[in-house]
Regions:
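Structural boundary/hinge residues at secondary-structure and domain interfaces
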Residues: 2-9, 13-153, 196-228, 267-301, ...
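One face of beta-strands
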Residues: 51-53, 113-117, 235-239, 246-254, ...
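Helix N-cap motif at beta-to-alpha junctions
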Residues: 119-122, 171-174, 257-261, 319-322
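Short, solvent-exposed coil/turn segments at beta-strand boundaries
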Residues: 110, 121, 140, 159-166, ...
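Generic beta-strand structural signal
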Residues: 104-108, 138-139, 159-161, 241-243, ...
Length: 351
């Protein structure tokens, strides 16, 4: 069931990539977003964070869309490390995770991630697993478990907020006070709260303050430096997704700093759309995809709808499982690539 996570990650990359490259030239009112109050988990995160992501995993798990999509995606090879984690803790996210909210801070050399998850947890087994390499302590009146990060230094801090809620902070710099990451401006996080309220009714959403996104960050195969000029006047980016029977409705909205820049964004997207159509008409380009992938990409270009409000530009698309499966299909080069053999090293069996 690790396919569920792979599907969600691929979905996010596909939607944002589509926003950068394709545009259906039509203007009109921006479609109504899935308004609502912030989910309880999101309310526990600092609203000053530059990037907040939320997923109602339980509702997605029950949706006909995800059930059909998972059936179309080949199962990945079993991860021995994850299998050991499930055996030791009794926790399998595909079964036990109900919802998760994540705040991400752009820190160097790696981002700081603050996550709160809700689900079914065996506190005794998870605590024992954390103490294999970590140690316990007290912070803000509750027990925390500080675990050294084996990759990139720093540590992870785990704590139980309630029996069914876990907080996990991955701090690559090893500091204990995440509050030092809070910006002095917008102390109450009112701007982020407003943007979240516009998408809070969605099963999955992400809101990013664009001035805090590193320009050298990679998004799939796209480096943001390549589209820095394209996005320089976008202040906020919001992504929301809601299952609709066997499909998934996705809205990507960019809020610009002026009406003129919103209009310019339309023109830029229109240019990318025409360029994408022209490229996909070339046999040399289409052969880089499977027939299913090329057909899905061509269909995606034609189905994306755009609307513009005063300072906002919104892209809306309805994805069927078959369309996403085609977009996620491996390229011919990936299909021909021989499997990578992982060298065994008995001396490093335990990390």
């Amino acid at each position: 069931m690790r396919r569920v996570a792979i599907v969600l990650v691929c979905l996010a990359v596909i939607i944002v990539g589509a926003a950068c490259y394709f545009y259906l030239h039509r203007t009109g009112p921006v479609p109504p977003a899935a308004l609502g109050n912030a989910p309880p988990l999101v309310s526990l995160l600092p609203p000053q964070a530059p990037l907040i992501i939320y997923a109602d995993v339980a509702s997605l798990r029950k949706s006909a869309f995800l059930e059909r999509l998972v059936a179309l995606i080949p199962a990945p090879a079993e991860d021995p490390e994850y299998s050991e984690f499930v055996r030791a803790t009794g926790f399998d996210y595909s079964r036990d995770l109900n919802s998760v909210a994540v705040a991400i801070y752009s820190t160097s050399p790696h981002p700081t991630i603050w996550a709160i998850a809700e689900g079914h947890f065996d506190q005794q087994r998870i605590t024992a697993y954390a103490l294999r390499t970590g140690k316990s302590g007290q912070r803000d009146g509750r027990t925390v478990y500080v675990i050294p990060n084996s990759q990139g230094g720093g540590n992870m801090v785990l704590s139980f907020l309630t029996p069914d809620r876990i907080e996990l902070i991955n701090n690559p710099n090893g500091g204990s006070q995440v509050s030092t990451l809070m910006p002095m401006s917008d102390v109450n996080g009112s701007a982020m709260k407003e943007r979240i309220s516009n998408v809070a009714g969605s099963s999955v959403f992400a809101v990013a303050r664009m001035d805090a996104v590193p320009k050298d960050m990679d998004l799939g195969s796209v480096n943001l430096e390549q589209v820095a000029t394209f996005l320089q006047n976008v202040q906020w980016l919001s992504l929301s997704a809601v299952p609709a029977e066997q499909n998934l409705k996705v809205v990507l909205e960019g809020k610009c700093d002026s009406t003129i820049h919103a209009a310019n964004l339309q023109l830029a997207l229109q240019g990318f759309k025409f360029m994408g159509r022209a490229m996909l008409s070339q046999a040399s380009v289409r052969k880089q995809f499977t027939p299913e992938g090329a057909a899905a990409l061509t269909r995606l270009i034609g189905e994306i709808d755009i609307s513009r409000g005063n300072q906002s530009v919104a892209l809306t698309a309805t994805f069927s499982p078959e369309l996403l499966a085609g977009l996620a299909a491996p390229t011919p080069q990936q299909q021909q690539r021989p499997p990578v053999k992982t060298p065994t090293n008995p001396g490093k069996a335990n990390h």
